[in-house]
């Protein structure tokens, strides 16, 4: 179809939207809305930007020999030239970028490149990850350049310090998240996020907060990075739904979530306030002792420390005991959007830093929506503008 969309994504500061179509790819500016680049280059399944620079990463759909889904192209849109091409053993399922690292996700591998020279610096063996569940912090500072991905399933290979694979013999770790330092190229912690497999991960702009959702999609949790302390627990809904997108605003006090339902939820995070009781500072890094009452916690510490090495013993001990994390009810949304898209339509969402803030929703149906968010009252957001990303529909469909 000439008027269909394969892929949509925001750039790292939510100022642009990249679009992949059966004909090629397009870049749109969010405010003011408008197309700023397009190229007919065959079907594109992944189009990721590096902030507002002319550097983009594209992966084809395989409709043409030069657009193999195993081939990643780094393109300079200003010069309209290909900087380099990288070919992988299997299809590329996801791409993440910041100013220091390019991360490429395959079915069971993650490749990390130095973006300044496109040299491979690290490879991580993972469990099968067909959904490319992963997040890379937009910040590439020395302290907060983190990559997060599902903790590998148990295998016969144990973790050895200095190697790039983490494995653990403990069962039921499908909902755990690995925090990986992209500067030191070492795992630094494991987050016990959910009991069921992960569906979506998101890091805030400075790499200090991690949002997680499982394949149930009813609960969204927010953890500190890299300490892995649970800070918030939000309820999206009562019935399971696939989570498509989670994004913090740049100030990290609002978080938007889209799913296979018609509702987009906006949650409020207040500075210094969490939905779980605080633990004294000396308790946070304490190493649990094995007593009958703390057997489960000690087991987590013992197994996790075996996986991550002795240097992480204190960090793994920062997991909050169940008696703390289970005492508070999850918080509900602060504001919401009722979408007009068909149920199940994939979408990505973000919250702007404007005053008042706006919620941006982009769908695979090919529409870009702008909603106003009332920070005082919350509640349902008002649609102010709607645009089409399709070539056969031009201009604003709603609003001025």
Swiss-Prot record:
Gene3D superfamilies given in the database record: YVTN repeat-like/Quinoprotein amine dehydrogenase
Biological process (GO), any one: pexophagy
Motif interval(s): L/FRRG motif: 234-238
InterPro entries attached to this UniProt entry: PROPPIN, WD40/YVTN_repeat-like_dom_sf, WD40_repeat_dom_sf, WD40_rpt
GO molecular function: phosphatidylinositol-3,5-bisphosphate binding; phosphatidylinositol-3-phosphate binding; protein-macromolecule adaptor activity
Keywords assigned by UniProt, alphabetized: Autophagy, Endosome, Membrane, Protein transport, Repeat, Transport, Vacuole, WD repeat
GO cellular component: cytosol; endosome membrane; fungal-type vacuole membrane; phagophore assembly site membrane
Subcellular location: Preautophagosomal structure membrane; Vacuole membrane; Endosome membrane
Membrane topology classification: Peripheral membrane protein
WD repeat start-end pairs: 193-233, 238-277
Statement: the UniProt record of this protein carries the keyword Membrane: yes
Binding partners and assembly: Component of the PI(3,5)P2 regulatory complex.
Domain notes: The N-terminus might form a beta-propeller domain involved in specific binding to phosphatidylinositol 3,5-bisphosphate (PIP2), leading to the association of the protein to the membrane.
Family: Belongs to the WD repeat PROPPIN family.
Function statement: The PI(3,5)P2 regulatory complex regulates both the synthesis and turnover of phosphatidylinositol 3,5-bisphosphate (PtdIns(3,5)P2). Necessary for proper vacuole morphology. Plays an important role in osmotically-induced vacuole fragmentation. Required for cytoplasm to vacuole transport (Cvt) vesicle formation, pexophagy and starvation-induced autophagy. Involved in correct ATG9 trafficking to the pre-autophagosomal structure. Might also be involved in premeiotic DNA replication.
Official protein name in the record: Autophagy-related protein 18
Organism: Yarrowia lipolytica (strain CLIB 122 / E 150)
């Amino acid at each position: 179809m000439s008027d269909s969309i394969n892929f949509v994504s925001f750039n790292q500061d939510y100022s642009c939207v990249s679009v992949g179509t059966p004909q090629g790819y397009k870049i749109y500016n969010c405010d003011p809305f408008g197309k700023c680049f397009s190229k007919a280059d065959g079907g594109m399944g992944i189009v990721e930007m590096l902030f507002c620079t002319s550097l983009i990463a594209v992966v084809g759909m395989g409709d043409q020999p030069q657009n193999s889904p195993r081939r990643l192209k780094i393109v300079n849109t200003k010069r309209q030239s290909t900087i380099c091409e990288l070919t992988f053993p299997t299809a590329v399922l996801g791409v993440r970028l910041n100013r220091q690292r390019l991360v490429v996700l395959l079915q069971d591998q993650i490749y990390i490149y130095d973006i300044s020279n496109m040299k491979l610096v690290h490879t991580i063996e993972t469990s099968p990850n067909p959904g490319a569940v992963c997040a890379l912090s937009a910040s590439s500072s020395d302290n907060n350049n983190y990559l997060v991905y599902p903790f590998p399933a148990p295998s016969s290979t144990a973790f050895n310090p200095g190697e790039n694979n983490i494995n653990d013999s403990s069962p039921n770790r499908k909902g755990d998240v690995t925090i990986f330092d992209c500067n030191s190229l070492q795992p630094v912690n494991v987050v016990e996020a959910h009991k069921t497999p992960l569906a979506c991960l998101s890091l805030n702009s400075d790499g200090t907060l991690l949002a997680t959702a499982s394949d149930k999609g009813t609960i969204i949790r927010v953890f500190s990075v890299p300490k892995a302390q649970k800070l918030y627990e939000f309820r999206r809904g009562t019935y399971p739904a696939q989570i498509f997108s989670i994004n913090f605003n740049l100030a990290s006090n609002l978080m938007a979530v889209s799913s296979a339902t018609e509702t987009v939820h906006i949650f409020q995070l207040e500075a210094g306030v969490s939905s779980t009781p605080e633990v004294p500072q000396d308790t946070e890094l304490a190493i649990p002792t094995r007593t009958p009452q703390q057997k489960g916690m000690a087991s987590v510490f013992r197994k996790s420390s075996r996986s991550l090495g002795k240097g992480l013993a204190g960090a793994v001990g920062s997991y909050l005991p169940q008696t703390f994390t289970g005492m508070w009810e999850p918080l509900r949304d602060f504001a919401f959007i009722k979408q007009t898209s068909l149920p199940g339509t994939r979408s990505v969402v973000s919250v702007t830093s404007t005053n008042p803030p706006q919620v941006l929703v982009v769908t695979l149906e090919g529409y870009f929506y702008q909603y106003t968010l009332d920070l005082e009252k919350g509640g349902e957001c008002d649609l102010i503008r709607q645009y089409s990303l399709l070539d056969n529909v031009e201009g604003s469909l709603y609003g001025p």
